[in-house]
Amino acid sequence: MFPGGKIDPRKLQRLMREMGMEQEPISGVERVEIHLKDGSKLVFEKPQVIRMKIMNQEFYQVAGKAKREKPEEEPFTDEDVKLVAEQAGVSEEEARKALEETGGDLAEAIMRLQGE
């Protein structure tokens, strides 16, 4: 497309504007996370991010090294939630919250809920 593979950046910017394309770097980005269907996520620390507008649609280009993080598993099951709710005489929602706060410790969650 371009002889010698080189092009003046100013010419490229002008050409992009003529085609209805805009691009703008976004500064100060600390972290970008892309959450995947399987519960894992791609995490970019201190990436370079560019917002591009092409024909009234916005696109974001993220450049940097991605790290894949596996989904965090709860340290307790739905059966644990039911047991705590039953033993403490509270709703399953309250039981789940107590289990989250205690890191899945059933006895501690029950004692906290009964102490309230």
UniProtKB/Swiss-Prot annotation:
Q: Which GO terms describe its biological process?
A: protein transport
- NAC-A/B domain ranges (all copies): 6-75
According to the record's subunit comment, the protein's assembly and interactions are:
Homodimer. Interacts with the ribosome. Binds ribosomal RNA.
Its annotated function is as follows: Contacts the emerging nascent chain on the ribosome.
Any coiled-coil ranges, and where?
none
Annotated membrane-spanning segments are: none
Which source organism?
Answer: Methanopyrus kandleri (strain AV19 / DSM 6324 / JCM 9639 / NBRC 100938)
Alphabetically list the UniProt keywords. Protein transport, RNA-binding, Transport
Is the keyword Cell cycle assigned to this protein?
no
A Gene Ontology molecular function term of the record: RNA binding
Family designation: Belongs to the NAC-alpha family.
> Could you tell me what this protein is called?
Nascent polypeptide-associated complex protein
HAMAP family, per database record: NAC_arch
